Amino acid sequence: MRSPAKTMPSMSPSSVSTEKSPPPSDTSMAIVAFDNSTTHFSSSPSPPHSLDHSSESEKEDAKSKPESRRNKNPGKVEETPSPIVVVHNHNRSVKEVVPTRKSARVGSGRSSGQRSGAVSAILRRSRREEVVKFSALGFRLSEVVLALISFSIMAADKTKGWSGDSFDRYKEYRFCLSVNVVAFVYSSFQACDLAYHLVKEKHLISHHLRPLFEFIIDQVLAYLLMSASTAAVTRVDDWVSNWGKDEFTEMASASIAMSFLAFLAFAFSSLISGYNLFNQGSL
């Protein structure tokens, strides 16, 4: 006997598809995962727009790196003494220009200081030379006056009468008179030369040996005046000790005193002559 066939319940196609098909959310996720894996391991070359985008991003990164490096230590730029320093390829040239300018300024200050020092030294030297010139002229005039008074008094030292006497009888008095006459002539010429030099800025007789000649003559006349005055004083003392004081001895003593003062004037003139000898350009 045949058993009756069992009839299966009929199902609509829509119901079958809904029961057996996976949920749509899972299917979308699987597709997304598959797509990502395929794109990740794909050996096909990337599209050109992606390369351009990557190269542009690399350029931007390369530009941003030095800027970030500069901004890491901003204090270093501020610590530099020169405000002109900029981080470029010509940074060395800028750094080299700044110290040269500073050194030029410092050098100009030193040069100006040296110029002012030289000017002040020249002014001091000119003033010293003027003082020396006027001092020399003053001593020369003193020599003229003192030598003139000395030999004038000695030449007039004469007495009349049976006990009369005269200076020309004693060699000491004659020696003193002669030395004072020579001193008067020499000092008169030197006084005229100094006065002419102060007015015209030149000497009556210009010679390279003139300072040496003046120094030697001043020294010689100073020693001669000293020796003549000493010899005349000895004769006066001998006369007074034997005969006592009178008009003759008093006039001789006055002449000797003027001669001694003339010696002092020549001594100072010899010092000035020595200064002029070792400073040829002063007078």
Swiss-Prot record:
Transmembrane segments annotated in the record for this chain: 136-156, 175-195, 213-233, 252-272
Pfam families according to UniProt: CASP_dom
Membrane topology note: Multi-pass membrane protein
Keywords annotated in UniProt: Cell membrane, Membrane, Transmembrane, Transmembrane helix
Residue intervals annotated with topology Cytoplasmic: 1-135, 196-212, 273-283
Region (Disordered), start-end ranges: 1-86
Extracellular face of the membrane: 157-174, 234-251
InterPro entries named among the record's database cross-references: CASP_dom
One Gene Ontology cellular component: plasma membrane
Positions with biased composition (Low complexity): 9-20
Compartments where found: Cell membrane
Keyword 4Fe-4S applies: no
Predominant location: membrane
Feature: compositional bias, Basic and acidic residues: 50-79
Family: Belongs to the Casparian strip membrane proteins (CASP) family.
Subunit note: Homodimer and heterodimers.
Protein name: CASP-like protein 4A3
Organism: Arabidopsis thaliana
Lineage: Eukaryota, Viridiplantae, Streptophyta, Embryophyta, Tracheophyta
